[in-house]
Curated annotation (Swiss-Prot):
It comes from Neomonachus schauinslandi (Hawaiian monk seal). Gene3D superfamilies: 1.20.5.20, 6.10.140.380, Apolipoprotein. It comes from the Eukaryota. This is Apolipoprotein A-I. Residues 67-266 are annotated as: 10 X approximate tandem repeats. GO terms for cellular component: chylomicron; extracellular vesicle; high-density lipoprotein particle; low-density lipoprotein particle; very-low-density lipoprotein particle. Glycosylated.
Length: 266
């Protein structure tokens, strides 16, 4: 039941921290989110790509060409994994520095979110109570029909469905009414939160124009440092890819040459 209320609440208050705002868990850092998403994406692409390569090599054409793509794929995966290990600490340092520079702004925004949460919580509790009452009322109306079905024969199934249909529609309509009422109650607070966030940014822009410039300058500085520190790792990646590409090129040329000889001999 609480999941329903939490889901509805997120519909009215947006933002990157919304899901953490209504929960007790600490939000992930930006680096953790990026790292998790990148890891999942790379793993899916790597595993899926290896499966396709393995299927191709197992085919008649793959056996005939004998390109040894799977060996090259494993070498490439190993090189990419090494790159991730080398760049990981550098990227972590970048996010740590950026979070440190924006700590004050994030604290002010979290304070606004917490204040709005306290104001809207009574409306969420009221909605949860009403929703529970509606579900309980629906359960009471449906219970006799279930007993009737158990006691009756199969031919009563259609009759039961006809009786359940209006009850389901009634529950849906009543739930929609409560949702609309909740939306109307939360709308002022949602607008208030948006106005506060806009005011924070406007204050930074006007009275704290220097602060925004400083944020931009420090972010650019951190990005430049990230690029410089990542150069050795990227160069290692390039050097690691060269043998793989050369091996693939030689295998492909040999396969084409062999196929040409077979065609000429026929």
């Amino acid at each position: 039941m609480k999941a329903v209320v939490l889901t509805l609440a997120v519909l009215f208050l947006t933002g990157s921290q919304a899901r953490h705002f209504w929960q007790q868990d600490e939000p992930q850092s930006p680096w953790d989110r990026v790292k998790d998403l990148a890891t999942v994406y790379v793993d899916v692409v790597k595993d899926g790509g290896r499966d396709y390569v393995a299927q191709f090599e197992a085919s008649a054409l793959g056996k005939q060409l004998n390109l040894k793509l799977l060996d090259n794929w494993d070498s490439l995966s190993s090189t990419v994994a090494k790159l991730r290990e080398q760049i990981g600490p550098v990227t972590q340092e970048f996010w740590d520095n950026l979070e440190k520079e924006t700590e004050v702004l994030r604290q002010e925004m979290n304070k606004d979110l917490e204040e709005v949460k306290k104001k809207v919580q009574p409306y969420l509790d009221e909605f949860q109570s009403k929703w529970h009452e509606e579900v309980e009322l629906y359960r009471q109306k449906v219970a006799p029909l279930g007993a009737e079905l158990r006691e009756g024969a199969r031919q009563k199934l259609q009759e039961l469905q006809e009786k359940l249909s209006p009850l389901g529609e009634e529950l849906r309509d009543r739930a929609r009414t409560h949702v609309d009422a909740l939306r109307a109650q939360l709308a002022p607070y949602s607008e208030q939160l948006r106005e506060r966030l806009a005011a924070r940014l406007q204050a930074l822009k006007e009275g704290g124009g220097a602060a925004l410039t400083e944020y931009h300058a420090k972010a650019s500085e951190h990005l430049s440092a990230l690029r410089e520190k990542a150069k050795p790792a990227l160069e290692d990646l390039r050097q690691g890819l060269l043998p793989v590409l050369e091996n693939f090129r030689d295998s492909l040329l040999a396969a084409v040459d062999e196929a040409t000889k077979k065609l000429n001999s026929q």
